[in-house]
Regions:
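Conserved AMP-binding loop of ANL adenylate-forming enzymes
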Residues: 1-20, 29-33
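Active-site glycine/GP-rich loop and adjacent strand/helix microenvironment
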Residues: 21-257
Length: 257
């Protein structure tokens, strides 16, 4: 699994860059340490664990696939790669298929499970109606959209969590309503997902060519309200912070960091 969890210290410079949950037979790989130099270790760990499939962010798995192809490494035999959290771009799919020699399946979902969809063998995203009710809100007009093809903010009501139901929850994604009438050549009658714009993820590019994602982990544990990281060049960054208070304790802790 290649997700956004910080599973090992960010400043670790030597493998292992992964941890294993033997009770669930799952291995979690750090996405923050993937480089051309560390990729052989990742591939060796994958071969040793011998998974049937990979789950992770397509942007990360595409970088891993690129390095595998760049170095001419033999990838492990997989049945499928399941991508989540981001849309799968065509160049990412091509890289993963070429490197791992297996199908790539796109999914849509979130930890709150207020909506979900998965890609069928025909390449169509089908929604899972049992996960929740998906609506589209047009913020400029301040109305809910009832027509197919009109994009707006996703508004979701989850149906799977009776303990903490989320009602008309806006998760920040945008797109259009599912199509309940269209039929897919795969034979499934589940509605076809409308367009998904999704959210974009920021990254920084280092001087040695690495791409670093999930930048919010940099600010974990700091006494701040919000933060902004601006990259001006490969070696120059501007960090803007709003402390919890301006009286002394928060400022002193930030100065110490």
């Amino acid at each position: 699994m290649f997700g956004g969890q910080t599973i090992i210290p960010i400043d670790r410079m030597e493998p292992p860059f992964w941890v294993t949950d033997y009770s669930l037979q799952q291995r979690y790989f750090s996405i923050f340490h993937i480089t051309s130099e560390t990729t052989p270790g990742y591939v060796q760990a994958l071969h040793k664990f011998a998974p049937s499939h990979l789950i992770g962010y397509p942007s990360i798995l595409a970088v891993l696939a690129y390095h595998i192809l760049e170095l001419g490494l033999p990838a492990p035999a997989l049945k499928v790669i399941i991508c989540n959290s981001e849309q799968v771009l065509e160049h990412q799919r091509k890289l993963m298929v070429e490197a791992f020699k297996c199908p790539v399946i796109e999914t849509y979902g979130m930890a709150e499970i207020t909506a979900a969809a998965s890609e069928c063998t025909a390449g169509t995203l089908h929604t899972w109606p049992e996960a929740g009710i998906l609506e589209v809100y047009h913020p400029e007009e301040a109305v809910y959209v009832n027509e197919k093809g009109i994009e707006g903010d996703f508004v979701m009501t989850g149906l799977l969590n009776p303990d903490m139901p989320l009602i008309r929850y806006r998760n920040g994604d945008r797109g259009s309503l599912p199509d309940w009438e269209a039929r897919c050549e795969c034979g499934r009658s589940l509605p076809r997902f409308g367009s998904i714009q999704g959210r974009t993820k920021d990254l920084i590019l280092t001087a040695d060519g690495r791409k670093l994602y999930i930048l919010d982990s940099i600010f974990n544990g700091l006494p701040i309200v919000e933060a902004q990281l601006i990259q001006e060049s490969l070696s120059s960054f501007v960090v803007k912070l709003v402390p919890l208070d301006h009286t002394g304790s928060s400022l002193a802790e930030l100065d110490a960091k």
